[in-house]
Regions:
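An acidic- and aromatic-residue-enriched active-site/binding cleft used to recognize and process polar
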Residues: 11, 40-42, 81-83, 143-145, ...
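Short, flexible active-site loop motifs that bind/organize anionic cofactors or intermediates
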Residues: 10, 52, 242-245
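Substrate-binding groove of N-acetylhexosamine-processing glycoside hydrolases
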Residues: 1-4, 16-25, 64-67, 73, ...
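Generic alpha-helical scaffold signal
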Residues: 14, 21, 56-59
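Generic enzyme active-site microenvironment
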Residues: 7, 79, 141
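Conserved, charge-rich beta-strand/loop surface module that forms ligand/interface-binding patches
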Residues: 1-13, 32
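Aromatic- and acidic-residue-enriched carbohydrate-binding clefts of CAZyme catalytic domains
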Residues: 2, 26-29, 34-75, 84-119, ...
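Generic anion/oxyanion-binding catalytic loop in active/binding sites
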Residues: 9, 110, 331
């Protein structure tokens, strides 16, 4: 397989530019020869008038990142969305007129009938190519386009506009003697024969993160087209801090079997998703994904892994200098963080290598432990709401759950303060604060609601007992 890549989703929670260099080292050591970088609002595009995230890297930091990738023989593949996933631009008043459906339309994708949208995309592409000289492959995105958004400017045939725009973007990049990659799903959903309308040499990347469509894959293999595949090595569940691992291993296993059947697939991307678009809550991708990236690399190199426990132990000894507790890691991460606590604490305290990832896993598991306790308290209070309101709960029960309210508040604040210095070694402070805010601000406000409900319940019980 020519290209073995990991996806770096920068629209979500990013590491510091300095720490990211060490991640490139590890990916190269694992056997990857490419990194697909999806920048969005973390790149300071001049073309978008400086409207970027406060934690965006500088162009100089990106140049350093690109140079480091080159030193490690890791091909940096820029990904610049050409159709949708554009809310990082279109959410701003300055660009509202470019929205599909007009100024009051969606901020998700732009209007393909407007020449301005093509010109803006080209200007942004030029900035990326200037910062990353020597780029050989460029990904133009083009996935998940909504063909049903009413737009007077577009008319009714959005698919035709879509294909024309994708073709123009591909031709623009090809004229610079670069290979062009795009996501395949719009063509998959509207007729794969339409790939023939694209310029020769454009490479579809077939992404399937749950069930694989084997009939479609067989047709793609028989078509003679060069294509890549894409698995999902990380995606979070209900905004947990740690991602579940086992479903991602199943996806990688399925793709491993496909690669054995169709060895002509010329590239693969292990995607690590932080969020759908930049207005959604953030999740963690790299560096948290390092176990699954190793699992993917082993699969791409040697085929489907048949003994996961053996692989986990070998990974642990090589990466951390100690064996991993497979059952604790894969049964408890995300789902039972309190049970995972002993495992990640031992890892943090005893790892002789890559203590950074051990600390990151520990810190995010601590977040999940806090959330687990809050969810337990809230679930009980929600189930008891009628009883609380009626004032029919005994005082000892109300006191117990009022103590839960206190702990939700005090333990959360103390826990966050305790782990923050450790996490700021790897993540920008504003990024960490945004992550914490999205998980706890609303919950602590809800906690005050339960304080009010339970205080009233205690007063009603006291009054009831007087009668």
């Amino acid at each position: 397989m020519e290209i073995k890549a990991v996806h770096f989703d920068m629209k979500s929670m990013i590491p510091t530019a300095d720490y990211a260099l060490t991640l490139v080292d590890e990916l190269a050591e694992q056997g990857f020869n490419a990194i697909l970088v999806e920048f969005e609002d973390k790149f300071p595009f001049d073309a978008t008038a400086g409207l970027h995230h406060p934690c965006a890297w500088t162009k100089e930091e990106f140049r350093r990142f690109g140079a480091h990738c080159k030193e490690k023989n890791v091909e940096l593949i820029p990904l610049l969305q050409s159709i949708g996933h554009l809310d990082y631009i279109l959410k701003y008043p300055k660009f509202r007129d470019l929205r599909d459906g007009g100024p009051g339309g969606t901020s998700y994708q732009w209007c393909l009938a407007l020449e301005e949208t093509y010109e803006l995309w080209c200007a942004m592409a030029e900035e990326l190519l200037e910062v990353f000289p020597g780029t050989k492959i460029f990904h133009i995105g083009a996935d998940e386009c909504n063909m049903r958004i009413p737009c007077e400017r577009c008319g009714s045939d959005k698919l035709d506009l879509y294909i024309k725009r994708v073709r123009r973007c591909a031709e623009y990049i090809q004229k610079k003697n670069l290979k062009v990659v795009l996501w395949d799903d719009v063509f998959r959903n509207h007729g794969a024969e339409k790939f023939a309308e694209l310029p020769k040499g454009v490479i579809p990347c077939v992404w399937m993160y749950r069930e694989l469509d084997y009939d479609y894959l067989e047709r793609m293999a028989a078509s003679g087209l060069e294509f890549w595949s894409a698995s999902c090595i990380q995606a979070h569940r209900f905004y947990s801090a740690m991602a579940p691992q086992e479903p991602k291993m199943r996806n990688v296993d399925a793709w491993g079997a496909v690669h054995a059947k169709y060895p002509r697939i010329s590239g693969h991307v292990g995607t690590a998703w932080g969020r759908i678009q930049c207005q959604s809550p953030i999740d963690v991708t790299l560096p948290q994904s390092m176990f699954m990236s190793a699992y993917l690399s082993e699969t791409l190199t040697k085929g489907v892994i048949t003994d996961r426990k053996k692989f986990a132990n070998e990974f642990g000894k090589k990466f951390f200098g100690m064996e991993l507790d497979y059952d604790a890691m894969f049964s408890y991460f995300c789902y039972e963080p309190t049970c995972a606590g002993k495992f990640v604490t031992e890892l943090k305290d005893n790892a002789s290598r890559h203590r950074d990832l051990a600390e990151i896993w520990y810190g995010f598991n601590e977040i999940d432990k806090m959330l687990e306790y809050i969810y337990t308290c809230f679930a009980n209070n929600e189930a008891m709401l009628t009883t609380w309101r009626a004032g029919m709960a005994p005082n000892e029960m109300t006191s117990n759950w009022l103590d839960g309210v206190r702990r939700c508040y005090e333990d959360t604040l103390a826990g966050l303060e305790r782990i923050k210095p450790m996490m700021l070694k790897y993540f920008p402070e504003k990024m960490w604060d945004e992550f914490v805010d999205q998980r706890f601000t609303a919950k602590l406000e809800q906690n005050e609601y339960w304080r009010h409900v339970l205080t009233n319940a205690a007063a009603k019980w006291k009054e009831y007992m007087r009668k």
